[in-house]
Amino acid sequence: MSKEGLPEVATIDATGISVAVISATWNADICDRLHERALAHAQQLGAEADGFRVVGALEIPVAVQEAARHYDAVVALGCVIRGGTPHFDYVCDSVTQGLTRIALDTSKPIANGVLTVNTHDQAVDRSGAPGAAEDKGVEAMQAALDTVLQLRNIKERASKRGL
């Protein structure tokens, strides 16, 4: 289980941080839960969060790119379940590369909470469902908000040193 090795993360105060959540609607039972739980976690931490929905995983990067122009951070959520063709690999690679490029191009946190799983049961177990081992929507939100604070800390320290 990928939960092994997950670091303990301190509770953060995300007051004043704006975050967009971009979620696919494909595999709705999974994506709806990821979306709702990520937004609820942002609200719990004090962030200003807005949610947006796109059809599938391939539409996520372009919506994330637009959101990154307006928000401090973006959380991308979706669920790609392996089928019998190579399409799974193309979709997963495309989404991951797109999100990484956007983060580097904008210098903004883009949290990748797009599940890439072999079975629907694996997706449920990572979606924050009752009894699930993991909650990737909450984890992605936590990572995005924490990274905003860390980037601000880096800028502040560099500025104090005249860098």
Swiss-Prot record:
Taxonomically, the superkingdom here is Bacteria
Query: What is a biological process (GO) this protein takes part in?
Result: riboflavin biosynthetic process
Catalysed reactions, as listed in the record: (2S)-2-hydroxy-3-oxobutyl phosphate + 5-amino-6-(D-ribitylamino)uracil = 6,7-dimethyl-8-(1-D-ribityl)lumazine + phosphate + 2 H2O + H(+)
MF annotations from Gene Ontology: 6,7-dimethyl-8-ribityllumazine synthase activity
Q: Which UniProt keywords apply?
A: Riboflavin biosynthesis, Transferase
- InterPro entries tied to this protein: LS, LS/RS, LS/RS_sf
Recorded hits in CDD domains, A to Z, give:
Lumazine_synthase-I
Q: Does the keyword DNA damage apply?
A: no
Catalytic machinery residues: 87
For this record, the Gene Ontology CC terms, alphabetical, are:
cytosol; riboflavin synthase complex
Q: What positions does the entry give for 5-amino-6-(D-ribitylamino)uracil binding?
A: 26, 57-59, 79-81, 112
Q: What class of enzyme is it?
A: transferase
What Enzyme Commission number(s) appear in the record? 2.5.1.78
Residue numbers binding (2S)-2-hydroxy-3-oxobutyl phosphate = 84-85, 126
One Pfam family from the record = DMRL_synthase
Pathway given in the UniProt record: Cofactor biosynthesis; riboflavin biosynthesis; riboflavin from 2-hydroxy-3-oxobutyl phosphate and 5-amino-6-(D-ribitylamino)uracil: step 1/2
Q: Which HAMAP family match?
A: Lumazine_synth
Described function: Catalyzes the formation of 6,7-dimethyl-8-ribityllumazine by condensation of 5-amino-6-(D-ribitylamino)uracil with 3,4-dihydroxy-2-butanone 4-phosphate. This is the penultimate step in the biosynthesis of riboflavin.
Family that this chain belongs to:
Belongs to the DMRL synthase family.
Q: What is this protein called?
A: 6,7-dimethyl-8-ribityllumazine synthase
This protein's gene is called ribH
